[in-house]
Amino acid sequence: MLRFFRYFLELVYPSRCPGCGKLIHTGGDLWCWQCQTQVWNPRMIRSSCTEHLSGCYTLTDYEKGMRKCLIDLKFNHKVPSARGFHLFLEKFPWWDSLADFRVAIPVPLSMEHARQRGYNQTDIIFEDWMIKQGKTYLSDGIIKIRNTVPQLQLLRNDRRHNLEHAFHVNRGVSLKGEKVLLLEQRCLRLIQNFKRCA
């Protein structure tokens, strides 16, 4: 019965690539091959390692279909298209090296953006996936305690100071001794010393 229902839905609402909108076969990937190859570029960002940060990984380039999909999710409330991100999470080549990072926490939005959107897009992209991988997902593990100027409006030297003392570990959350995956929609950051980040 479930198979028939899915078949019926596919006839009425055919699957489309979230990147370009082209019709795709439901038995395959959610992204068309062309969009996948245009954005798929897993790597560790150079200069991302610091005393307290093990590295910053990114799975795709932020352009073309990926940029469109993230903008649709953030600003146009196209939440169903977020299921397409799991394809890239599945293909990420370094999950084995992250096995001892047991806790996953999204970078929090400002209170104003959270109120406007009603959700944190990072939760929508990562939460189900991380839970299926056996990670403890703390959607409110970090809170933003003061508003900041959008980073895009600042010079490189001013960006670090803009974020100082902007985040804090939420009351009742203990991360002492934990290695934490700090998640953001445009990159996956690894934090070993959480105090420095907070």
Task: Spell out what each predicted region is.
Residues 1-198:
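Glycine-rich phosphate/pyrophosphate-handling loop used in enzymes and phosphotransfer proteins
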